[in-house]
Amino acid sequence: MQVYAVGGAIRDELLGKPSQDRDYVVVGATPAQMEAAGYKPVGKDFPVFLHPRTKEEYALARTERKTAMGYKGFAFYCEPDVTLEDDLVRRDLTINAMARAVDADGNLTGPVIDPHGGQRDLAARLFRHVSDAFAEDPVRILRVARFAARFHEFGVAAETMRLMREMVAAGEVDALVPERVWQELARGLMEAKPSRMFEVLRECGALARLLPELERLWGVPQRADYHPEIDTGVHVMMVIDQAAAMGAPLTVRFAALVHDLGKGTTPADVLPRHIGHESRSAQLLEDVCVRLRVPNECRDLALVVAREHGNIHRSQEFSAAAVMRLLERCDALRKPARFAEALQACEADLRGRKGFESSAYPQAARLLAALEAAAAVDAGAIARACGDDVGQIRDRVQAARVAAVAARIGG
């Protein structure tokens, strides 16, 4: 049998980028031969094995045939007569359909095997599908969009974009399971320029099917004095790119993505104002989170940011009592780390505006100082001092916290 490293590891080597892991394909072997060599079977849908020493995954070369809609609708053939070329032709993009042989020590040997012009497309900075079999797996639309967020200087070949549009029109993306959609969106949000993912999804029509709440933001105007970029969709893309530039975690990036969904439902006769968009945003994102089965930690932070980002922006003008009420609505005393992430999302929101990219955000330091002061109040001591008058405990703790906040930040 012969082992090859395939896909991303070869692509990244040619780009001079580090590769986090390698994918291996084994040609000319049976499952029994792999187990006899010490490999442990782990694949459910097709034969995948763990290397006895490195624990890396090795898959038998395979072909696949479409049997139903969606990304699970495939039958696989994994016999020893499947060649490397047979395996590579089923892959999504030419830049991911290259291979190099691997020796017994795991070292890459020999030339790059590139039957589909992957090196040509790397040089041209293009995402191009290998064959029309691309259309059989709708997840590939999401993967192309995610790759665009990682390799943001790349474009999508015209024929590939045309095929993606045909897939969307045929309803292929409608068959995707929510968990897989979320997985790909989350991975794309964590790339260097997540806005590119959504640009590609918009261009092929998939965003309107997967996230219509986000799609409808494009073309919705905002007040030019607050948003020189005007267009709400453009603003949100600037915000998620700012969150990425700040190195923010997924929770913050998702909150940045969905914080203004309510602006897409603002009545036309009140534009470009968006009165009450915060509560509408919260309702819409709850629907999104249910539909895509978004993790609770992402949903919870996004709800805080959607509801309170306007107040957080204005908090420099707040009295100590108003700041304390804001902290309570955000549950900041019980969840200070989440509150810090909310402030990071709000900072990205401010900077995600034309001309504001390098602006300071003093609101964050002031509110964190207020939170620190409020948290230092000994609520237990106050409760004990109240004795049997338990009805006074809440009011006295609140008064002590407001006084502590006022002493720290004024007001």
Curated annotation (Swiss-Prot):
SMART domains this protein is in? HDc
Query: Do you know which PROSITE patterns this protein is assigned to?
Result: HD (PS51831)
Tell me the ranges covered by the HD domain, including all copies. 232-333
- How and how many cofactors are bound, per the record note? Magnesium is required for nucleotidyltransferase activity. Nickel for phosphatase activity.
The record's comment on protein family reads: Belongs to the tRNA nucleotidyltransferase/poly(A) polymerase family. Bacterial CCA-adding enzyme type 1 subfamily.
Annotated GO MF terms: ATP binding; CCA tRNA nucleotidyltransferase activity; cyclic-nucleotide phosphodiesterase activity; magnesium ion binding; phosphatase activity; tRNA binding
Domains (record comment): Comprises two domains: an N-terminal domain containing the nucleotidyltransferase activity and a C-terminal HD domain associated with both phosphodiesterase and phosphatase activities.
| Binding residue positions for Mg(2+) | D21, D23
Described purpose of this protein according to its UniProt entry: Catalyzes the addition and repair of the essential 3'-terminal CCA sequence in tRNAs without using a nucleic acid template. Adds these three nucleotides in the order of C, C, and A to the tRNA nucleotide-73, using CTP and ATP as substrates and producing inorganic pyrophosphate. tRNA 3'-terminal CCA addition is required both for tRNA processing and repair. Also involved in tRNA surveillance by mediating tandem CCA addition to generate a CCACCA at the 3' terminus of unstable tRNAs. While stable tRNAs receive only 3'-terminal CCA, unstable tRNAs are marked with CCACCA and rapidly degraded.
Misc. comment: A single active site specifically recognizes both ATP and CTP and is responsible for their addition.
What protein is this chain from? Multifunctional CCA protein
Assembly state and interactors?
Monomer. Can also form homodimers and oligomers.
Q: Where does ATP bind?
A: G8, R11, R91, R143, R146
Catalytic activity reported? a tRNA precursor + 2 CTP + ATP = a tRNA with a 3' CCA end + 3 diphosphate; a tRNA with a 3' CCA end + 2 CTP + ATP = a tRNA with a 3' CCACCA end + 3 diphosphate
Q: Which InterPro entries match?
A: CCA_bact, HD/PDEase_dom, HD_domain, NT_sf, PolA_pol_head_dom, PolyA_RNA-bd, tRNA_CCA-adding_enzyme
Which species is this UniProt entry from? Answer: Cupriavidus necator (strain ATCC 17699 / DSM 428 / KCTC 22496 / NCIMB 10442 / H16 / Stanier 337) (Ralstonia eutropha)
Task: Tell me yes or no: is Protein biosynthesis among this UniProt entry's keywords.
Answer: no
Q: Which gene encodes it?
A: cca
Its cofactor is: Mg(2+); Ni(2+)
Keywords, sorted A to Z: ATP-binding, Hydrolase, Magnesium, Metal-binding, Multifunctional enzyme, Nickel, Nucleotide-binding, Nucleotidyltransferase, RNA repair, RNA-binding, Transferase, tRNA processing
